[in-house]
């Protein structure tokens, strides 16, 4: 389980902390949702958990032990809201192999099938993919690292309804074997699909009373 205790973050240019006294638990197998308006600190929370930034206060723990930023970078896989801005490979194949000295073709094919991209042309440019395909490709890149925690920034934003349902089901399947946190401004899409649902407001987490806990069968 990934856990925060009294987590705080105060940007130097902000009049007040963006996150303050934040306690959050991400158990394996129980997807968690954090909703909030733009600028509420959702993405900052993901960056702290992923080891891309350091909190000003509090602790981040994995299985009860303090977890450094470097450890969190190995532990967590972060998929950004706009993955196309973070693609570095000129082709799908290059993007998938970045950072891997050795990666068997069978492993790549298995992950692409897992995210619904079986048969995707390896020489296709990532920026030529549809929005839904780009999200899936970014997810495949992270899954190849075999992270213990998946952190997803607005995974359904801008997708049509049919693709949204497919992505939602994929996320639930992935959450069975790892900790998973989704941040979104569309919490209603996850109704009945998550174990915990929170709203980030004023730097703190509040329960979302309209969200029913528990996964869909």
Give the residues covered by each predicted segment:
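ABC ATPase C-loop
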Residues: 142-143, 174
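Conserved ABC ATPase "signature" region
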Residues: 105-121
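ABC-family nucleotide-binding domains
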Residues: 160
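Conserved H-loop
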Residues: 178-184
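Catalytic Walker B motif of ABC-type/P-loop ATPase nucleotide-binding domains
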Residues: 150-154
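Helix-to-loop junction immediately C-terminal to a conserved catalytic motif
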Residues: 50
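Conserved ABC ATPase signature
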Residues: 125-129, 133
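Conserved ABC transporter NBD signature motif
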Residues: 58-74
